[in-house]
Amino acid sequence: MQKYHFTGLDCPDCANKLESALNKQSYVQEARVVFNTNTLYLKTQDMPKALALIKQLEPDMELSEQVQSEAKPSAIPLLLSVVLYLIAVATIHFSAQNWALHLSYALLAGVYLVAGKDVFLGALRAIRNKQFFDENTLMLSATIAAFGVGAHEEAVSIMVFYSAGEFLQQLAIARSKQSLHALLDVAPNHAVRKVGQELQEVEPSALAIGDVVIVKVGEKIPTDGVVLRGESLLDQKALTGESLPVNVKEHSAVLGGSINLKGVLEIQVSKLYADSSVAKIVDLVSNAVSQKSQTEKFITTFARYYTPAVFAIALLIALVPPLLGHGDFDTWIYRGLFALMVSCPCALVISVPLGYFGGVGAASRAGILIKSVQTLEALSQVKNIAFDKTGTLSKGEFNVIDVVPIAPFSKEDVLQHATCAQILSTHPIAISIQKAYKRQCQHEVKDYQEIGGLGVQASCHSHLIIAGNDKMLHKYNIPHDTCSLEGTIVHVAVDGKHIGYIVVADTLKDNAKECLDGLKHAGIEHMCILSGDHEYSTKRVAKELDCPYYANLLPEDKLNAFKDFQAQHAHKSMFVGDGINDAPTLARADVSMSMGSASQISKESADIVITNNSLESVLKVFKIAKKTKRIIIENIIFALAIKAMFIVLGLSGDASLWEAVLGDVGVTLIALANSMRTMRI
């Protein structure tokens, strides 16, 4: 699929119509016009023909493969129109001279033409393309009808206020787009490659694995790599949501898109730019907002029928009452024009996708990557969550929580011998014991041997040391009376004598309890833990969190347990895992979330990726989803209510046309401002 950036398209309804027209063509497999990011995705067998159709429907639209800045709308024509309109109206009402009145009406005609230039051109283009219910066509029809019933000043005021509204709307849209583009602007735009003693400025995409790049203070790291020389602080807020700078030095892994805050770094490239963390993040966010939620699809379909329906209502208001003898045609045509004033669905067509985009953007800034707006919408409907334990609720890091010596040996003796036996091991349990001892083994270790599933043995200071589980002691016929201990136990024996054991456990993540309590308050009704770990460890964590659990689950068992969990409870269910061993369950869930890091994004298959590995982000993304949904519903209800109110006012004759125009424009601006609140969640 080809991706284009465009300029010259300033109407969201026009974007929807262009997308619909392209998708109707037999030579187009798929077309998506994303108004909020000025992006066109096009998959076609005949690109020249597709581009020609775009030019026919939107002559001012310019396509480019590079992002281009849009020119800001000029306020001069609008200001000129307003000034001349006020002069003309004042002259009509306060001057009795015939020549002044004639001049004033000539001025009104000029104002009408200047203010309505874009409307005339848009209407002409719409009629040529057989789009008779285009907003420009309807606005032109309304003003001509107003002239026809003698409401000359109001006809011109409609055009002036409509132009003012369009100008303010364009400014608001431009501002919102700037916020959205800033979100996607985390990608570096250049790299300084070191070749020998020469420095070359190149595109990040031109870098190869093994290249060396120089990154100065204030510059972005072009792609993922490893620090060869230098020490610095990196700002990774745009990638992980972490506000505190990260300290890096020689041999530290760094992420593309990080901003260098201090010192010069020499970095060896470890990933091509296309595979880098920052490229994946930009791609995920861009792809997310290019999709349409169910609400957006409904609004797009609704807008297709809304305008013709309102036009029909306006026609009925204008014709039926006078034909039935209730008043004259001029009065009812004037009232029917009210319906035409509210015939444009812009308030909904703009605000709904912008609201979802803002929600995705707010999540991204917090280190939460949502892969589609459909996911954000579905997340607001989730009532049930199942958690993996290790690496999700717990840190996935073992710690020594108890040391039990057997007299005459001490805790120090047990830790020392266990450390010496496991000094060459890289197993997480061995590392936790070494960390607890806090000293290095002072004696030479010989004959080190790992025995799969049991433990290790080694010779140290003329002693044979064994460190392992209960089965290890039985294998070597070492007497002991501690066979039924619960938990992860490392027994230690020296020269065939059991000297004690060490209890090792995974620890809960910070704020895990607060997070689950927060989820309950946020509307989650049912939670459980699905773990592949043994019963004791899972039970201990579940007890701390006051949560049901299932332990000793293989991947297929975990999938079946989650299916049962889904079947037992109504509404959508989500699974939160580490994204590594939970693939079947992640795929089964209505919404799937994985705890990971920014460097693992390309490996994740979940709908949502928490790049900062924080449980607080699980609660935050729920709040974002619910607030986004609430804001969008507010906009829909508000816009439809105001439009209905103006139709009623039109029927009763209690307001003038220019008030209807201002009201309709005001609805759009308020809905737009309300949608932008999602960016600040």
UniProtKB/Swiss-Prot annotation:
Q: Which UniProt keywords apply?
A: ATP-binding, Cadmium, Cell membrane, Cobalt, Cobalt transport, Copper, Copper transport, Ion transport, Magnesium, Membrane, Metal-binding, Nucleotide-binding, Phosphoprotein, Translocase, Transmembrane, Transmembrane helix, Transport, Zinc, Zinc transport
**Does the record bear Ion transport in its keywords?**
yes
Residue numbers binding Mg(2+): 578, 582
What residue ranges lie in the Cytoplasmic compartment? 1-72, 125-131, 175-308, 351-630, 677-681
As its record notes, the protein acts as a catalyst of: Zn(2+)(in) + ATP + H2O = Zn(2+)(out) + ADP + phosphate + H(+); Cd(2+)(in) + ATP + H2O = Cd(2+)(out) + ADP + phosphate + H(+)
- The catalytic activity of this protein is classed by the Enzyme Commission as 7.2.2.12, 7.2.2.21
Domain of life according to the entry: Bacteria
Q: Where is the HMA domain?
A: 1-66
Output the InterPro entries linked to this UniProt entry.
ATPase_P-typ_cyto_dom_N (IPR023299), ATPase_P-typ_TM_dom_sf (IPR023298), ATPase_P-typ_transduc_dom_A_sf (IPR008250), Cation_Transport_ATPase_IB (IPR051014), HAD-like_sf (IPR036412), HAD_sf (IPR023214), HMA_dom (IPR006121), HMA_dom_sf (IPR036163)
Biological process (GO) annotations held by this record are: cobalt ion transport; copper ion transport
Main EC class of this protein?
A: translocase
Q: What's a Gene Ontology MF term here?
A: ATP binding
- Membrane topology recorded in Swiss-Prot or TrEMBL: Multi-pass membrane protein
Q: Where are the transmembrane segments?
A: 73-92, 103-124, 132-151, 155-174, 309-327, 333-350, 631-652, 661-676
**Positions that bind Cd(2+):** 11, 14
Localisation: Cell membrane
- Active site at 388
The answer to whether UniProt assigns keyword Phosphoprotein to this entry is yes
Binding-site list for Zn(2+): 11, 14
Q: Which residues lie on this side of the membrane: Extracellular?
A: 93-102, 152-154, 328-332, 653-660
Provide the leader sequence positions: none
| Protein family (similarity comment) | Belongs to the cation transport ATPase (P-type) (TC 3.A.3) family. Type IB subfamily.
Note the PANTHER family from the entry. Answer: CADMIUM/ZINC-TRANSPORTING ATPASE HMA2-RELATED (PTHR48085), CADMIUM_ZINC-TRANSPORTING ATPASE HMA4-RELATED (PTHR48085:SF5)
Protein function: Couples the hydrolysis of ATP with the transport of cadmium, zinc and cobalt out of the cell.
Q: What is this protein called?
A: Cadmium, zinc and cobalt-transporting ATPase
Q: Which organism is it from?
A: Helicobacter felis
